[in-house]
């Protein structure tokens, strides 16, 4: 049987799933919003970040992971929230919510400021172990997604693709979306070789993503 490039991540075994559940069932709190590098918290724990286009479902996914609906809040205006938001997972992890990219509603100076901060963060955060790049399963990889992937390649930060809203696409449409995503990822050396398929609404893939984060080593 031919092995597909960038296969879907398999569901974790019972022990690994429980490890992920415990990480996200503990104290999960918003720590701070950061607008400049000198505002970053101490680099004293494992750090993962979530990146994605505006309206990709990033805040909803973070809330599904933590089981807290109001923890991460989506901006009503795409491209306007330009803070790097830090959340603590127990005393061992930072979960970092990067601003949604897609700048149709944002002034040029805001776009430039955000791009500079993002580049500095990705290249200068030694404890950042993995980025999770969220892609809407209905639409696949867009040009702005390619831009963030290129930044991650340059910064040598491993990134893993998470397809969101998978419950909204079925059968051949889902297969086509996966094929397009795999083709795009083949051009990026920093791409982690598994894709996680999620639905925040249905809970699909949430245990897998929790377990993946819980097993990332220092």
From Swiss-Prot:
PROSITE patterns named among the record's database cross-references: G_ENGB
Family as reported in the entry's similarity comment: Belongs to the TRAFAC class TrmE-Era-EngA-EngB-Septin-like GTPase superfamily. EngB GTPase family.
CDD domains: YihA_EngB
Gene Ontology MF: a single term: GTP binding
Keyword Ubl conjugation assigned: no
Protein name: Probable GTP-binding protein EngB
Organism: Jannaschia sp. (strain CCS1)
Function: Necessary for normal cell division and for the maintenance of normal septation.
Cellular-component GO terms for this entry: cytosol
SUPFAM superfamilies in the cross-refs: P-loop containing nucleoside triphosphate hydrolases
Chain residues that bind Mg(2+): 59, 81
Lineage of the species this protein comes from: Bacteria, Pseudomonadati, Pseudomonadota, Alphaproteobacteria, Rhodobacterales
Spans traversing the lipid bilayer: none
Domain EngB-type G, chain residue ranges per copy: 44-218
Coiled-coil stretches: none
Cofactor list: Mg(2+)
GO biological process, one term: division septum assembly
Binding residue positions for GTP: 52-59, 79-83, 97-100, 164-167, 198-200
One Pfam family named in its UniProt record: MMR_HSR1
UniProt cross-references to InterPro entries, sorted A to Z: G_ENGB_dom (IPR030393), GTP-bd (IPR006073), GTP-bd_ribosome_bio_YsxC (IPR019987), P-loop_NTPase (IPR027417)
Keywords: Cell cycle, Cell division, GTP-binding, Magnesium, Metal-binding, Nucleotide-binding, Septation
């Amino acid at each position: 049987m031919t092995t597909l490039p960038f296969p879907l991540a398999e569901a974790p075994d019972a022990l690994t799933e429980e490890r992920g559940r415990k990480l996200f069932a503990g104290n999960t709190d918003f720590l701070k919003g950061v607008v400049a590098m000198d505002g970053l918290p101490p680099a004293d724990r494992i750090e993962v970040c979530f990146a994605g286009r505006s309206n990709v479902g990033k805040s909803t996914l973070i809330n599904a992971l933590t089981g807290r609906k109001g923890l991460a809040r989506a901006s009503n205006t795409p491209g306007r929230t330009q803070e790097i938001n830090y959340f603590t997972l127990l005393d061992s992890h930072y979960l970092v919510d990067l601003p949604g990219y897609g700048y149709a509603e944002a002034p040029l100076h805001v776009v430039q400021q955000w791009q500079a901060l993002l580049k500095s963060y990705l290249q200068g955060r030694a404890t950042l172990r993995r980025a999770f790049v969220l892609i809407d399963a209905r639409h696949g990889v867009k040009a702005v997604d390619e831009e963030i992937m290129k930044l991650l390649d340059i910064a040598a930060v491993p990134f893993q693709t998470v397809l969101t809203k998978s419950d909204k696409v079925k059968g051949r449409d889902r297969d086509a979306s996966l094929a397009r995503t795999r083709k795009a990822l083949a051009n990026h050396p920093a791409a982690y070789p598994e894709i996680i398929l999620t639905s925040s609404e249905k809970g699909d893939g949430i245990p897998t993503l929790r377990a993946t984060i819980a097993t990332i080593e220092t």
